[in-house]
C-alpha cells in the first residue's frame, strides 16, 4: 500500500516535471525523485501518549454480562421473598415444643417435625410412613405372586415333558369330509 502511494506521488511529480510546471514543490517534494517520502503537512498526534493506539480485536462480553445480570435478578427475585417468609415464620410462629400426647389421640405424621416449614413440607409433599409401608408391602406381594407363578409354570412344563403331553393351546384339526371342494360362483358361497 505504501509502495503504491509512493509510486503514485512519484508519477504525479514526474508528469509535472516533464510538463514544465513546478507541481512537485507544491506537493511537498523538493524536486523530481530527490526525496523518497513526502514531508508531513501537519504534525501527527497520538492522543493519550504512549504511541499509536491500536484497535485490539477481542470477543464480545455482551452475553456474559447479560447472563450475570439476569442471574443476579432471578436470584434476588426468588431469594428475597424466601428469606422474608422464613424470617416471618421463625419470628411469629417459631418451633414446636414437645408436649404430652392426650389419651386416645393419634398424631399425624407431620406433627413429629419441630420446624413449621418442615411440617408444611411433610404434610403437603411427602407420603405418610404408613402409606410408604403399604406401597412397599404391595410391591413385595406382587413379586411373590410372580415368583410363585414362575415356579408353577416350571412344574407344569416338567410334568408335560414327563407325560408326553402337548401344549395346552393345541387344537385338533377339523375333519376333511366337512370341507366343500365344489366349484363356487363367488368366494363366499
From Swiss-Prot:
Which locations, inside or outside the cell, does it occupy?
Mitochondrion inner membrane
Q: How does it sit in the membrane?
A: Single-pass membrane protein
- Asked if the Swiss-Prot or TrEMBL record annotates the protein with the keyword NADP, the reply is no
Positions of transmembrane segments: 73-93
**Alphabetically ordered keywords of this record:** Electron transport, Membrane, Mitochondrion, Mitochondrion inner membrane, Respiratory chain, Transit peptide, Transmembrane, Transmembrane helix, Transport
Q: Which cysteines are joined by disulfide bonds?
A: none
What domain of life?
Answer: Eukaryota
> What family is this protein classified in?
Belongs to the complex I NDUFB5 subunit family.
Q: What does this protein do?
A: Accessory subunit of the mitochondrial membrane respiratory chain NADH dehydrogenase (Complex I), that is believed not to be involved in catalysis. Complex I functions in the transfer of electrons from NADH to the respiratory chain. The immediate electron acceptor for the enzyme is believed to be ubiquinone.
Self-association and partners: Complex I is composed of 45 different subunits.
Q: What is this protein called?
A: NADH dehydrogenase [ubiquinone] 1 beta subcomplex subunit 5, mitochondrial
- The record lists the organism as Macaca fascicularis
Q: Which gene encodes it?
A: NDUFB5
